[in-house]
Amino acid sequence: MAQLSLQHIQKIYDNQVHVVKDFNLEIADKEFIVFVGPSGCGKSTTLRMIAGLEEISGGDLLIDGKRMNDVPAKARNIAMVFQNYALYPHMTVYDNMAFGLKMQKIAKEVIDERVNWAAQILGLREYLKRKPGALSGGQRQRVALGRAIVREAGVFLMDEPLSNLDAKLRVQMRAEISKLHQKLNTTMIYVTHDQTEAMTMATRIVIMKDGIVQQVGAPKTVYNQPANMFVAGFIGSPAMNFIRGTIDGDKFVTETLKLTIPEEKLAVLKTQESLHKPIVMGMRPEDIHPDAQEENNISAKISVVELTGAEFMLYTTVGGHELVVRAGALNDYHAGENITIHFDMTKCHFFDAETEIAIR
């Protein structure tokens, strides 16, 4: 088991490209941390610096209180699973899982015990004598996980391990990795560009953009209390709707909208001196309802209808604004149809239009 401390971590390449900027994070023992962000945000580079595969340009990496910057990768007690399974095609599943242990000259009976234990956890016992070519993509990924598990490392690092799998297998493997974390009870750091993976697996999420940490928090926290517009738009599918406007009395107004703001949210706007400058209102698709209430209703025209099974995603035009509305599947909706939508203003978010930081 392991605690990690990343203190002012920097990564600058020889061409002066600054990939990771002042990265700070404390990771407790047994946490499941997910680094998430768009391509090129620095998440995989940060993971590789933890693993010892990339040199740290500045700052300190501590594992269990020991500075690891100059410690070689093989001495960090870390196991890593990559996007590509990197299995030896000529070896059996057993030999692939045992290979690293054999290189460490660990006793054969210990190797046998660990491999069989990992195979039992991962449901691979019946495949131990097969070669990777005879396995499905999900099974090959489990072998790669097994190869990491048998090392009994203090930290497990996973770099987009599910991105080569189809959608159904990704869902299945998400659950398997979460169960694996519970069984092993060890520290895991996982990199993905998929916010759904981050939301469903992490104890805490680290959202990155352009090498900078935007927010760190539990999935529910970053979803309900995003630090800025980037986080609000990145976490959640479909993304949060954004509308630019101003405050007029107790109303959020645009050229075509006038919505009443609840007193508690209006008080925050007053405290933060946001009443007389442009702001951005954010609304999750599930907080805009296709039915009329006493106030905060407006007519919308449906442009696209997506049925996901249990619900509809309605892509609508509202007074020049493009908004996504999440609706139950009890009613039918059609492109070109006009509907009345209701804004649940108790759930709205406000952001500074200039800095894009949440107003709280």
UniProtKB/Swiss-Prot annotation:
InterPro entries on file: AAA+_ATPase, ABC_transporter-like_ATP-bd, ABC_transporter-like_CS, ABC_transpr_MalK-like, ABC_transpr_MalK/UgpC-like, Mo/tungstate-bd_C_term_dom, NA-bd_OB-fold, OB_MalK-like
Alphabetic keyword roster: ATP-binding, Nucleotide-binding, Transport
Binding sites annotated in the UniProt record for ATP: G37, P38, S39, G40, C41, G42, K43, S44
CDD domains, per database record: ABC_MalK_N (cd03301)
Gene3D superfamilies listed in its UniProt record: 2.40.50.100, Nucleic acid-binding proteins (2.40.50.140), P-loop containing nucleotide triphosphate hydrolases (3.40.50.300)
This protein's GO CC annotations: ATP-binding cassette (ABC) transporter complex, substrate-binding subunit-containing
Superkingdom per UniProt: Bacteria
Domain ABC transporter, chain residue ranges per copy: 4-235
GO biological process, one term: carbohydrate transport
Protein name: Uncharacterized ABC transporter ATP-binding protein YcjV
Species this protein is from: Escherichia coli O157:H7
